[in-house]
Curated annotation (Swiss-Prot):
Localization (cell): Cell inner membrane
Transmembrane segments: 11-31, 48-68, 71-91, 105-125, 137-157, 164-184, 194-214, 218-238, 262-282, 292-312, 328-347, 351-370, 402-422, 429-449
The protein, known as: Putative multidrug resistance protein MdtD
Entry GO CC: plasma membrane
Organism name: Pectobacterium atrosepticum (strain SCRI 1043 / ATCC BAA-672)
Gene: mdtD
Keywords annotated in UniProt: Cell inner membrane, Cell membrane, Membrane, Transmembrane, Transmembrane helix, Transport
UniProt topology in membrane: Multi-pass membrane protein
Family: Belongs to the major facilitator superfamily. TCR/Tet family.
Annotated NCBIfam families: efflux_EmrB (TIGR00711), PRK10504.1 (NF007799)
PANTHER family, alphabetized: BLR6921 PROTEIN (PTHR42718:SF46), MAJOR FACILITATOR SUPERFAMILY MULTIDRUG TRANSPORTER MFSC (PTHR42718)
Organism lineage string: Bacteria, Pseudomonadati, Pseudomonadota, Gammaproteobacteria, Enterobacterales
PROSITE patterns recorded: MFS (PS50850)
MF (Gene Ontology): transmembrane transporter activity
Amino acid sequence: MTQPASVRWQLWIVAFGFFMQTLDTTIVNTALPSMAASLNESPLHMHSVIVSYVLTVAVMLPASGWLADRIGVKNIFFAAILLFTLGSLLCARSETLDELLISRVIQGIGGAMMVPVGRLTVMKIVPRDQYMAAMTFVTLPGQIGPLLGPALGGFLVEYASWHWIFLINLPVGIIGALATWFLMPNYTMQTQRFDISGFVWLAVGMATLTLALDGNRSLGIPPIAIFALIAIGLIALLSYWLHARRNERALFNLRLFDTHTFSIGLTGGLLARIGSGMLPFMTPLFLQLGMGFSPFHAGLMMVPMVLGSMGIKRVVVQIVNRFGYRRVLVASTLLLALVTALFALVALMQWIWMIPVVLFFLGTVNAIRFSTMNTLTLKDLPDPLASGGNSLLSMTMQLSTSLGVSIAGILLGIFSQPHIAAESGATHTVFLYTYLSMVVIIALPALIFNRVPPDTLKQSTLARKS
């Protein structure tokens, strides 16, 4: 990839944004037990720290591309980095869980805009024939983030404090914001009117239903308010459906669901990612509270999972071409349920030596399923609907992760005692029952993926979309 120096600097700016966002998604998980102790909260009720961020990203994603086109990629990317950095500072200064959750929402608004606006920036600054090479360059730091995050988070918690997992964003964010302001051009595009009504209906529906899912246990919301939240959420989603039926310029066109593979991929992927979303949250908790590992040791133990994920991506295309979408999705879903069951066995038998092996296979199977799900969902969409389908898929991925973490927190709360100590028999029982429940949830999408139609032209389709 040969580019002028100015363009290379702009690509580096986007790459830094990708790195900040992906690092944050993994660095926090390892620190949750220490954060709980500092804030006088139960470590099994800290999932709201993850949910608040991921749900905010899901809600804000649909607006990010339109804002970038209307206001300019430089202005929005600059604002995104500032918001993310400000949110990080506020997270580090939080003294209560409520303060931390508000700060995570601010951080999530910035995080929601960084990655999609970064992609849009790359599209505008490089020729189309060099787009793939440029995206490979800017996403490489994003692949390093998940690898570095758990170990770095554990190291900072163990040898400094949990506040530093947020403070390390400050110098990177300040440098990134200054570089964006002085080096990035402010591309704009003529835009159609933004579907504000559809955006509000979807945002209200997602937020209220997610809050209702765990509001009683985590936030102490009374049952009558929970029922009200559920009613508001369902009414909001129904209102969006009615709105989109009569509006061709709706945020997400309902004609997307006329494509059979998109419908199966989106619904199956939503349920599948609910199950998968539980695992990155559960694993650091299990290693620290269930197995008695230090934060740094627990973070290092997560590395095999990332290595398994990165290693298998090179051969996913060949696997799908050989066996087809339906077989790969059904088999990988059931294999993931089996690997999750092995966590229950580890909790029961205390087989510490088995943990890196289980985590490696967890990362491998997850990567196969994710890549195949994403490709299946988008591969048959007509070109006019492809952009909207991709945006809806991105939003659904974040929403399902939020739901998965919420459900994992609910399961932990159901099975836990009021006070537990690391390495206690009660703790092992909590994780044993939680993992066994997760096995059922993770296996369920196999029923949906079994409806994938017979594969045709697998190689050309996957190679073009992956």
